[in-house]
Amino acid sequence: MTQVAKKILVTCALPYANGSIHLGHMLEHIQADVWVRYQRMRGHEVNFICADDAHGTPIMLKAQQLGITPEQMIGEMSQEHQTDFAGFNISYDNYHSTHSEENRQLSELIYSRLKENGFIKNRTISQLYDPEKGMFLPDRFVKGTCPKCKSPDQYGDNCEVCGATYSPTELIEPKSVVSGATPVMRDSEHFFFDLPSFSEMLQAWTRSGALQEQVANKMQEWFESGLQQWDISRDAPYFGFEIPNAPGKYFYVWLDAPIGYMGSFKNLCDKRGDSVSFDEYWKKDSTAELYHFIGKDIVYFHSLFWPAMLEGSNFRKPTNLFVHGYVTVNGAKMSKSRGTFIKASTWLNHFDADSLRYYYTAKLSSRIDDIDLNLEDFVQRVNADIVNKVVNLASRNAGFINKRFDGVLANELADPQLYKTFTDAAEVIGEAWESREFGKAVREIMALADLANRYVDEQAPWVVAKQEGRDADLQAICSMGINLFRVLMTYLKPVLPKLTERAEAFLNTELTWDGIQQPLLGHKVNPFKALYNRIDMKQVEALVEASKEEVKAAAAPVTGPLADDPIQETITFDDFAKVDLRVALIENAEFVEGSDKLLRLTLDLGGEKRNVFSGIRSAYPDPQALIGRHTIMVANLAPRKMRFGISEGMVMAAGPGGKDIFLLSPDAGAKPGHQVK
């Protein structure tokens, strides 16, 4: 049946840029990729995008811990994430970052429209503050007991047990995740998005019938509890986008994170030189379809805040949300100690991507059910289905076709009715792929595979091959088997991209959804090469052991500058502003008689001379080499009387000490007396 081509934009939830991709992440990206590949096979115009969620306090603090900038950390993490997704053959058209100019502009645009339309409210709130670290605590940096279901060890924004959202101040017995201290309350002005104004619109959207029943039911519970205004601002220090005309205030990561979908698509349009498509997909009256694949833990943000933000800023809402459950391994939560918290890159060191893609797909449905990766069942199912049923169908027929008929298939089908049974299944299987009933699609395909193998068993080409005068029968039987293999692989193409490539090379033709209506007759195939290898439990054992070793390595003591010399306690901006740093010219440098550590520096501050004693002699055995250099000094440090004289300041240097001391210098152009700001 001919379909009208649709314009479709598909997204996955944005992975957070402070950690590696693991098998829990991969469920969603595989699910979305299978659906996208099917849509492309049916001739639809699909844009499949994602990005790293790159803002927030966790990223800022982890970068500090690593001794690098947040920008450097998220850049490195983006490369790692993209490598992992490419390894699993996730066919993104674009992978971007929320820390981008596109996302900044769109975040400011949406915020300004919401503000102009009266949906942004200002008020002073009492907020949890870490007295030991000197910082306000983001939601995810406070833990305590859920105020709704009383589950312990829950984050400050939502409960992973009951799904409730709340303010971190509502937590019972809260603790700072940063220091372990009990937070104290401090006042701060914050900006709020007026979510209750959109209650009627959101309830109508919920009742439209597009959302999964479980999602709609959960949303109804939230409506009955009453929607609350949403705090969209955070106080400095914070890594993110500063709110326009609000110094020291930043957009909360959950405001600009979903806008990252738009930012990534805008980046893709700009790369293509296509200025039309962005509005075509995101304008209020867009006829394009927009789907978000997400986990059940972020339904609240995507089903309430996100559509309300879009509505309030005159953009289109999502067509639907496709929500999935969590991944367990061997019936339990992924565990680092048991070696079942498995990174995507670790998996690819032991198994190919198609194996996990197939196993997840075989278990997925349109419901929000958790998926268990039972590693023993995984081995058995991959071997039984992919190797024994599908690949074996090709291998047991290809040998005869290659050896006896120079790779040429028969001119007629041996069993046209059986072939029709296979092609007639396209509607049922296609509908299963379309509706995300992936497990049903796989069951239908494997039932056909059983039928195909039964046909070969009954026809027994290995027996026919030994009988004189039956060459035509042998060619017909084996050609039939290969044609049935082609249909099966066409149905499995969205799931098994690498196996599909090898199958297409053998069949000497591209596998297309509509192409199966015409069997390969009188067609020459290529010599058969092994398409897929069996897997075994030894590989699983090696995978689990490797995951355990990675955990041990990650737990090893951190080495490097920060380990030896940790960052000091946080200071306020006012504290920092008291330090007057100036550019100084070193006019003279000499040894200090009676000291094996000090150099006497004569510094020119642009009209004022200073005498400074500095403990850098071990790194600069020839003090004359410093004369003429510019450096940075603390100009308002109280003079210090020493037995060699008075030191009138301090020069800035870095390094662990000894010979490894490095005097700081400003860029060319800085002049003596210039203030460092």
From Swiss-Prot:
Any one GO molecular function term: ATP binding
Motif 'KMSKS' region positions after renumbering to this chain: 333-337
Name of the gene this protein is made from: metG
Cofactor dependence: Zn(2+)
Alphabetically ordered keywords of this record: Aminoacyl-tRNA synthetase, ATP-binding, Cytoplasm, Ligase, Metal-binding, Nucleotide-binding, Protein biosynthesis, RNA-binding, tRNA-binding, Zinc
Oligomer and partners: Homodimer.
Cofactor detail note: Binds 1 zinc ion per subunit.
PANTHER family noted in UniProt: METHIONINE--TRNA LIGASE, METHIONINE--TRNA LIGASE, CYTOPLASMIC
Protein name in UniProt: Methionine--tRNA ligase
EC number: 6.1.1.10
UniProt similarity note: Belongs to the class-I aminoacyl-tRNA synthetase family. MetG type 1 subfamily.
Domain of life: Bacteria
Gene Ontology BP annotations: methionyl-tRNA aminoacylation
